[in-house]
Amino acid sequence: AGTCDQECENSSGGGDDNQYYTLVWSDEFDGDTIDESKWNFETGNGNWGWGNGEHQYYRQQNASIEDGKLVIEARNESFNGFDYTSTRMQTRNKGDWRYGKITASLKVPSAGGTWPAFWLMPTNSVYGGWPHSGEIDIMEHYGCNPGDVHATVHNTIFNWNGGTPPTSYSMYTSATSEFHEYTVEWTEDELSFSVDGNWIGSYYNENSGPEQWPYDQEFYIILNLAIGSHF
């Protein structure tokens, strides 16, 4: 996973070969343990299953480093009243950014009921609670549809309770068997999504206010593997 600050203007939608960045943060997971100067671990099941009806209990012990790769393992085991455990880790107050390029190389599980995600949430919800301060989903995958991978945004206008974000997509049948690079390039005007350098969609700032574009604040990275939901 890595993030870069922008050094020149983005002149076209996503994946532009003339785009230059300076690396400001990365984690190559090349140590023996996860670097807690970069990552926080969220625990428990949140409110109402993290708002989604998820079935797992998050804990740090389900994340490890193997052969230079981060592994998040969902387990079918009883723990604190739940039948599954997994990990949710994030960079809040250790890695927070406004604008730039954020990317990670990921391989997702193929088991039904799994819901891995690589996404961004606001460090400070200056426009109010979810969805008003925004959410940026760089990669989501549902194990019941192994050939589909999704990227999208959420805000006051576009959220699960109304509206369809224009950046949703489905592709990549090899998502569960190979690593792919999932990226968002974020400027004050555009969120541009790509997979392996291939542009797949953009969401644009229409200058109509934070209801449509709350993406002018700092966000942080989340990596997690959920089990089940009410979606």
Write out the residue ranges for each language-model feature:
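GH16 jelly-roll
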Residues: 14-231
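Primarily marks secretory-pathway-exposed extracellular/lumenal segments that are disulfide-
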Residues: 1-13
